[in-house]
């Protein structure tokens, strides 16, 4: 191509390369390489081509640099040239990917795909599917290669296979269902001659069923399914039940339980005394008497079984009352008082009442009674282990034996006065900043502004001293209360004190900020006054 025919649109760098605004770096490089091959001084000897190559190289350097290109794009947008499209012959070299021409080979391939996709319509029964449905390839007219001759096999069709039946098997006469058998699918086999066998012998190779007379069954179930269901239900119900304890089945009441517990405790105490001070003969006689008493109590319990059952049934409405069994040598228990002190039956016991009662009690450490715990030295060691309950029956379970009573948590609240918080600090009003609207050419106005600034600084310094003193008192109080403020009852007051400290610091910061603003404004005012020649 001759250089005289090259005409470049130098309106923009994009139009110079024959590209639209916003072209990619790949298209910019391709356009530059195309123009460089034509305009390079080594390829063309004209001076005009050399000048154009410099312009094209400069445009390429700007558009390939990201920062320069971004700056240049902003200039084009500001001037409205980002929508400019060149109409010269150079702009025709840029073709977007979607504007490429379609070749004849591509058109032929699309037409072949359409012909291959079209299928000839066939009835549903004749449409091939399953095994052996591959169509035989027929030799084409223009193809010179001979095709391999294969024997035509009959394709497998599920519909025709479904309707092919054995003609020798007669259909059932009782079957009234509709059949999809059609005359189109007739088997090619020759029908067999009708047999002369009677119908009673059909089907062959099978013995006729014996019609047995139903015998009356002794089972209460109608069928094995009913029997299996009943057995399964019985087994699951039996496994779900829990074994009943003999103590639960025996009816008892509150009075019987307390009397039995008292008798057991008395027997243990008597046996301990006998082992320590008695003889083996007395122990044996006492053991025999205990057995007789147990037998008599069992007989008495068996005789009163009906009465105990009645008491259990009426336990929700009223509590059964029974006279205690008197015993010699023991202290009688008033069952009415026990019934009033014990919780009622079938009612949830509230542990909060116990906790409140323990909180109200003032537990004090008591001295151990050394005389009561003294044990003679001639008593054997096994007897000493069981000696304390028998020797000291009047002792209380609340008294310490070998353990010290744990200390009760004592509340130590700090009064608000010990935190050294001056509540009047929150009502302090900060001084207002003076105005600097004065004539810098008038000395009297400048002196008046100076007096206002001095008065403002005096008030601000006085307030700062007061706030700093409050902070020093608070720090001293925190050092004195260092171990007490971390207790649970003082945490709320401790947080309130820290909020007070923050409020004082914020006021101090605001005063400092106002003084800084006033100082800067006055400095600027005096500079302007000195610059104007007032002083």
Curated annotation (Swiss-Prot):
Compositionally biased intervals (Basic and acidic residues): 112-125, 224-238
GO cellular component, as recorded: endoplasmic reticulum membrane; nucleus
Residue span, J domain: 12-76
Listed InterPro entries: DnaJ_domain, DnaJ_domain_CS, DnaJ_subfamily_B/C, J_dom_sf
Compartments in which it is found: Cytoplasm; Nucleus
Coiled coil: 446-499
UniProtKB keywords: Chaperone, Coiled coil, Cytoplasm, Nucleus
A Pfam family hit: DnaJ
CDD domains documented for this protein: DnaJ (cd06257)
The gene coding this protein: JJJ2
Protein name: J protein JJJ2
One Gene Ontology molecular-function label: Hsp70 protein binding
UniProt region (Disordered), positions on chain: 87-256, 284-303
PROSITE patterns membership: DNAJ_1 (PS00636), DNAJ_2 (PS50076)
GO annotation, biological process: cellular response to misfolded protein; chaperone cofactor-dependent protein refolding
Top-rank taxon, per record: Eukaryota
Ranges of Polar residues composition bias in the record: 135-153, 176-190, 242-256
